[in-house]
Every structure is written in C-alpha cells, then in structure tokens.
Design a protein with these regions (language model features):
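Mature catalytic core of soluble alpha/beta enzymes
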Residues: 1-322
Length: 322
C-alpha cells in the first residue's frame, strides 16, 4: 500500500511517500516524522529566537556554549564542507542574510547593515568557530552569526529517513522543499522518479527527471528567492568570500549524494563557486552535479560524475519528460 504523509515545518512542508503493509497504522509514523523535523527546526532555525542556533549567535566571543549533540553533528559537517570548498559553503553568513533582507530581521536590503555585515563576514566559519564534540560545546572566536539554512533541511530529510528505518520501512521517498532522499526503490523494484524543476521565475515547469534509489538529491538556484538590484538578479544565497549575494550565471545546481545533508550543502557550495570554479571542485571531490546555466537567453547543461555527457550510463539519469 502506498502511504502519503506530510506536515508543516520551516515555513514549508515535509512529505513522505512510502510502501507499507495494508494494516499499517499511519498515525504513530506521522507523529514520529513530525517530531523529527520539529526537533531540527527547534535547534537550528534562525527564525526562532529561542532556538539553539540563535542562542549560539547571541553568545559573546570566546564563550563556550553547550549545544545538543545533533546540532554539533551538523555544525561539524558544515565546517568540514566549508573547509573542503575553501569557503564557498560558509555557515557564517547569518549577518549577510539579514542585511540583504532574506532573514528574520528585515525584508529588503539595508545599505548600512550590508556594510557592517561585510566587515564582520570575512572570516569563514571553519576558521572562526571551534567545536568540542566530546564536551558538547562550541566557541566563537569572532563575532560571526551562524546560518544553517544551507544544510539543515537536508539534515531534516536524513532524520525522516532514520525514522522510516526505525519503523522497518524499506521503500520510501522523503522530501522537504528541494531536498529529497530515496530509501531503497519503490516496492515494485522501480526507482523513484523525481522531477527537476525548470529554473524559470514565476512559473513551475519540469526540466527533466532523475531516478533515485538509495540516494539523496538537492537543488539550489536563483529562481525562487532573489532581489533585483540595478537590474541584476541577486539570489538569496550568500557568497561569504565576497560578503555579497551570489552573482553568476548558474540558474540551478543539482547534486546527488548518499545523505541529503551533504547534497544540500554541496549544492549551495557549487552554486556559490559558480561555473568558473565549481566544475573543478566537483571533479576533485568526486561530486555528482548538474548545472543549468543561463547563456544568451537559454539554459545550458553542464555536469560532473554521472551527469557528465562523456560518462558511461548509470542507474540515475536525467531526461526530458515526454
């Protein structure tokens, strides 16, 4: 029996499609899934003043802040990806997000706040945030503001998959916004088919389809949330290296990984790295990524791993829908 569950979280909705026995009571499973995403939101939301993230952001420099083990796990992976990407993925962009009007503080850019945030955002998180995993504490060595929006939703999807595994469910697709993870195949053995959204602002259309089996996928782009400044489209994703929003011709970037947390963070990193540095980074780190670039009024594909047109065919493919 195909079971479809969903609920609210993080300003959007989570969903799970799973194949279960006909006599399965969905209520305990749905409650456990909701509790899992609610816990991530309570710990890591920049929109909730009482979250553990905001408690860390309010803490004075050099003070040691006790944090939940789950959040420290996400922070540790965020810092590792920040290091591997040379700061392209940087969770220390919270002040920039707020200054440009994409956070909880304001809904439009503020020139003075942008200048101040730029002065305090030059040191990436992997150089200015220390974690003591054994003691369960974090310590800021600079006045940075952490934002985990580029990794927390992916982690929430992984948490949903962990719940499904706890309930001995072997065939499922968990989703939260543009982050999805397949647990096994469908019950009939077919992979899960996931539509890739075309990055055209103002409309919902399908660019292609990805087939997933025991894999996660995440997409980042400039087409959902952006501001127009001087006629230029500036995405809500921040480039901490420039202390400014991402500004390149990447319309969207889709990444496959074993965990949704990694897919989410690497999609952000490759969006920031852009078409000049992103492909080399993807090849160096063995990432599987599909870029959609805006070139002379059309979308151009560029890929790595199984998305590389020169690569041999793999179970995960992209194609135009019929």
């Amino acid at each position: 029996m195909r079971l479809n569950l969903n609920g609210p979280t993080m300003g959007t909705r989570w969903s799970v499609n799973c194949d279960v026995a006909p006599d399965r009571d969905p209520k305990p499973l749905r409650a456990a899934l909701q509790a899992a995403v609610d816990l991530v939101d309570a710990q890591m939301s920049p929109w909730k003043p009482g979250s553990d993230l905001m408690r860390l952001n309010r803490a004075p420099v050099d003070s040691r802040v006790e944090l939940p083990a789950e959040m420290l796990y996400v922070l540790d992976r965020a810092l590792e990806i920040s290091r591997l990407s040379a700061g392209a993925f940087d969770p220390a962009v919270g002040a920039l997000v707020d200054a440009w009007g994409f956070g909880a503080v304001r809904d439009e850019p503020d020139a003075q706040a942008i200048r101040v945030a730029g002065d305090t955002s030059r040191c990436p998180a992997h150089q200015s945030l220390e974690l003591d995993l054994d003691a369960g504490r974090a310590c800021k060595r600079a006045g940075l503001q952490i934002d985990l929006c580029g990794i927390a939703k992916g982690h929430a999807v992984d948490c949903m998959v962990a719940v499904l595994q706890h309930y001995d469910i072997r065939h499922a697709l968990a989703a939260l916004d543009g982050e999805l993870r397949a647990l096994g195949s469908q019950a009939d053995g077919q992979p899960w088919a996931v539509a890739l959204e075309s990055p055209e602002p103002g409309r919902r259309a399908v660019h292609g389809v990805i087939e997933l089996q025991d894999l996660a996928v995440a997409t980042s782009g400039d087409y959902r949330r952006f501001v127009l400044v001087g006629g230029a489209r500036l995405a809500h994703t921040m480039d901490g290296r420039r202390a400014a929003p991402v500004r390149n011709d990447v319309a969207s970037i889709t990444v496959l990984a074993r965990t949704c947390m990694d897919a989410d963070a690497w999609a952000t990193a490759l969006l920031v790295a852009g078409p000049s540095d992103g492909p080399a980074m993807a090849h160096r780190l063995g990432l599987e990524a599909l870029w959609l670039l805006r070139r002379e009024g059309t979308l151009v594909e560029m890929g790595s791993g199984r998305f590389d047109s020169a690569a041999a065919p793999e179970p995960v493919t992209t194609h135009s829908p019929s």
